[in-house]
Amino acid sequence: MPIITLPDGSQRQFDRPVSVLEVAQDIGAGLAKATIAGRVNGERRDACYVIEQDATLEIITAKDEDGLEIIRHSCAHLLGHAIKQLFPDVKMAIGPTIENGFYYDVDLDRSLTQEDIDAIEKRMLELAKTNYDVVKKRVTWQEARDTFEKRGEPYKMAILDENIERTATPALYHHLEYIDMCRGPHVPNMRFCQHFKLQKVAGAYWRGDSKNKMLQRIYGTAWADKKQLAEYLTRLEEAAKRDHRKIGKALDLYHMQEEAPGMVFWHNDGWTIFRELETFVRTKLKQYDYQEVKGPFMMDRVLWEKTGHWQNYADLMFTTQSENREYAIKPMNCPGHVQIFNQGLKSYRDLPIRMAEFGSCHRNEPSGSLHGLMRVRGFTQDDAHIFCTEDQIESEVTSCIKMVYDIYSTFGFTNIAVKLSTRPENRIGSDEMWDRAEAGLAAALAHNGLEYEIQEGEGAFYGPKIEFALRDCLGREWQCGTVQLDFALPGRLDATYVAEDNSRKTPVMIHRAILGSIERFIGIITEEYAGFFPAWLAPTQAVVMNITDSQADYVQKVAKQLSDVGLRVKTDLRNEKVGFKIREHTLRRVPYMLVCGDKEIAEGKVAVRTRKGADLGTFTVEEFAEILKNQVRSRELKLLNEE
């Protein structure tokens, strides 16, 4: 006689075991129609799941995040159903959900074209429109393997052989004649899977291992209703317009090439932005009392063995040999900073020591994961490490948080998601130490009045951490900043200080990054601003142009005046119509265009226009120089008179 407790505390008693869907029907026909699955005692279950004992139950509908994920997972099965009908010889691998959608890896003896993808999507919609029921069946391990052997599915058999215990009872989901294996839950009926779009095909190795066969990965997105799908596709279109790779090429910021995969060739204009970011962060380092250091590019493997990187991180490290010694190019800066700390005896009076570096790091990321500036192999971190006592953790973390928000606000990022990652199961140190560390981070967040999400067990083995994710104008999250406590590395590298009682103690190390990878941050702000960088970051801040050849000398004079006060200025003296020049520099996103005609020469002025088409009128060169200098000095986000 199960008693079901609902989220509002009310209870319903049944005289027999009852399914999730039957409970929903007992509550009301409308809820039953909307039921996708249920959360029974906190665990997601299919709508057909039978509850035999007293339990708590939350009904999952398309309005819930869980409901949307289940829809997406079922759309992956729908994709499998459709592709099997169109290409009977295809071998199905895995089809999980991802952010905003799903994918399925398939093994097919020819490359899928866009026409194929369109046909698969059309068949998916035809199948979904029949509103067929999805039937779940529990079978023995051997029955599951026999099923997939008969169906010629070697990848499903491999999953059973390598990942599922022989005593398990796998769940097979039947989509009419198509069968897939999954932990679930899935939708009870395909009427929930009507709003989807297949997006692209990419290569993916089976098991993510380059030694295995390359499969074709079909990506798709799925939503609860037509409106959500349309809004998402609109956001994708806007994101495509803002793609930093496209804008980077149009603005001649950088390029990448096959001979140096994942490495950036910075062009003059892109490097100008890079250096401006470094200059800005340096002003903040001074303000927050950091010292700036520079560590070596590579170090002997002996050091990396001490840190544990050689044992746990070797696949991501580039190595080289010389004179019978093996070296690793640094993937991170922290071991080098500990070496600097270790030079000379340190006292508790010297702490905290805040050590910052624009460190050039390299990681051997898989080639398939590389993506413009967002995922590279060679990058520069605005990295810092703070050596302090346990008593100083809260105050130092508070200072780090203030610095994070100080810097992000300059770029217009005010919507920041904060996450606190706590102790994992496998960790070093005592529970008391972790209690103090987590309490210190939580207190620092509270001190700054920040709401945060706790990520249980997501901390590193050597300490808890705070993550800061920027939400951009398209609602995407970019995880950039981290404040990470480390109780392990200083001890592994023999870092000590003389405590107040004259004993030797190991300092706590706080890893602190704000921009993270500068390369990636440039990619983020390129997309955030759509290439319309604020004046202080713009590679060229103003272009001075003539109307006819007779104004050329005046244009040169104006440009020199502006350059002499530190502004980045170019001239355009081409024998082209001024409207053509304005259009061209508008496309180049130059903040200000200064037009010099006979009238401006006679008045000793310049006519100023913005890249958004605003006519600001005429100014003396001195007036305009002061306006632009003030904008640069204060790092304003908007141009003059810009909404």
Curated annotation (Swiss-Prot):
Which subcellular locations apply to this protein? Cytoplasm
Its cellular-component GO annotations read: cytosol
Query: Among its keywords, does the record have RNA-binding?
Result: yes
InterPro entries associated with the record: aa-tRNA-synt_IIb, aa-tRNA-synth_II, aa-tRNA-synth_II/BPL/LPL, Anticodon-bd, Anticodon-bd_dom_sf, Beta-grasp_dom_sf, TGS, TGS-like
Q: What class of enzyme is it?
A: ligase
PROSITE patterns, per database record? AA_TRNA_LIGASE_II, TGS
Give the Gene Ontology MF terms in alphabetical order. ATP binding; metal ion binding; threonine-tRNA ligase activity; tRNA binding
- In the Enzyme Commission scheme, what number(s) does this protein have? 6.1.1.3
Keyword Zinc annotated: yes
GO biological process terms on file:
threonyl-tRNA aminoacylation
Q: Which reaction does it catalyse?
A: tRNA(Thr) + L-threonine + ATP = L-threonyl-tRNA(Thr) + AMP + diphosphate + H(+)
Keyword annotations for this protein? Aminoacyl-tRNA synthetase, ATP-binding, Cytoplasm, Ligase, Metal-binding, Nucleotide-binding, Protein biosynthesis, RNA-binding, tRNA-binding, Zinc
Q: Which family does it belong to?
A: Belongs to the class-II aminoacyl-tRNA synthetase family.
Entries under NCBIfam families matching the protein: thrS (TIGR00418)
Q: Subunit notes for this chain?
A: Homodimer.
Q: What does this protein do?
A: Catalyzes the attachment of threonine to tRNA(Thr) in a two-step reaction: L-threonine is first activated by ATP to form Thr-AMP and then transferred to the acceptor end of tRNA(Thr). Also edits incorrectly charged L-seryl-tRNA(Thr).
Entry protein name: Threonine--tRNA ligase
Q: Which gene encodes it?
A: thrS
